[in-house]
Amino acid sequence: SAFSGRELARKMAVVLTDRVKPELMTGYDIVATGRYPYTGRLGILSREDIRKVEEAMSLVDAKDLGSRLFVSLSDGQKQRLLLARAICQEPEILVLDEPTSFLDIKYKLELLDILRRMAKEQGITVILSLHEIDLAGKISDKVMPVKAGRVYDCGSPEEILREEFIRRLYDMDKGSFDPVFGSIELPRPAGKPETMVISACGRGIPVYRRLQKEGIPFIAGILYRNDMDYQLARHLASRVIAAEPFQDIEDSVYEEAREAVSGCSRVYYTDIPWGSSNRRFRQLLEEVKGRRDARCIYEASGDRIGYGT
C-alpha cells in the first residue's frame, strides 16, 4: 500500500538544489520543520524534538545560524541548515541533489564526512547526485553514471571511475581523467618537445604543470612506473621514458633517454634521492651539464639555478 505523507517523510528526506525562500523564518525554524512528521496536529515540538534539532545543527556546525533569518544567509549557510533539517528528520533514505554546491572546501569536506558517517554508523542509505567525479570516488560505495537521461552503468568506484570509461561517458576528445589522482587534466601542449624534465618522487609535478600552462611541450624521464611523476607525466608530457620499478635502469632505457635529451635545448632537473638503482639518473644529468648547447635548470622549492648557456 502507498505511504501517507507523514509516513513517507519518516522514511525519506530530500535536500534539493532549489533554494526555498520562506519569509520571517529563522535558521532554527527551518531545521525544526524536519521534526513535523513526528509532531501532533498543532506541530508543537516536544523536548525530544528540540534535542534532535539542536543535535542536527551541531552536527553541521550551524548552531550560530539558528537565530538569523534564513533569507539573510549565504547559499552555503542555507545548505548546511537544509542538511540539518534532513538529518533531524531521521530518515531511512536521504536523497541530496548537488549537496556540495555553494560550499567552500572546508564545509564540503565536513559535509561529505557527515554523510559518510551517517551511512556507516546509522545505517542510512544516502543517495546523492554529483558532478565532481573525484568526490564521488572518495565517498561512494556504488556509482551510477547517468548519460542522456538514462542510467549508463552501475558499479563500485574502482569499476566505474576508469580513464577510458570516463572518456566514453562524457564523449571527451580533449584532455583526460586520471583515476589515481581523481583529477581532470587539460590536453598536453602540442608541438615538437625541445625541453626535458628529469625528476622523481613527485618533485617534477610543479614543473610539468608550469610547462603545460606556458604551452611548452616536454619529455619526462627517466621515470619509474610506480612514481607519482610518471602518473601525471603520461597525461601531460609529449613523451615519457619509463623504467620498471625496483630494478636497475636497463641499457635500452638509458640510451632512449640519452637520445631524447640530445635533441633538447633546455633540461629541468629536481631534487632526486640518489641510490644504487637510479645511479644512471645522475650519469644522464652529468652528461647534460657537460653540454654547451643546452641550458640545465635546477628546480627546488620554486627556485631556479641555471647552469650552462
Model-derived segments and spans:
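Conserved ABC ATPase signature
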Residues: 43-44, 69-73, 77
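Conserved catalytic motifs of ABC-family nucleotide-binding domains
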Residues: 90
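Catalytic Walker B motif of ABC-type/P-loop ATPase nucleotide-binding domains
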Residues: 94-98
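Helical segment within the ABC ATPase nucleotide-binding domain
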Residues: 109-122
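ABC ATPase nucleotide-binding domains
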Residues: 171-249, 269-270, 276-279, 297-309
